[in-house]
Amino acid sequence: MSNYVIPQPAQPSRPVQGTDARFPVRRVYCIGRNYADHSIEMGHDPDKEPPFFFQKNGGNVDSSGEFPYPPFTNEVHFEVEMIVALKSGGANISEADAMQHVFGY
């Protein structure tokens, strides 16, 4: 057990339906295909370069969690993401083999 100078947050995880197991949430890679207008606004061609970004685990809130924000906030923007949880890594995976790498949704 490490003695951290600054306490580390707990490992984010999600329950696996029908079991008592949990799936760890480590890295979330996002492809914003629905961000075409914003991509064009930023000078990019979304058909050639799909917007790609990372989601920080600390920013993830599930349906049972709270979303803290400053009390005098007048406007809050939110998004809902659909995720695919992978059970194995890989690169250049064919479409025919892709589902072999999926743990769940």
Q: Which positions does each model-derived feature cover?
A:
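Extreme N-terminal tail/first-helix region
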Residues: 1-16
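Glycine-enriched loop-and-adjacent helix/strand subsegments that border the catalytic/binding cleft
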Residues: 17, 22-105
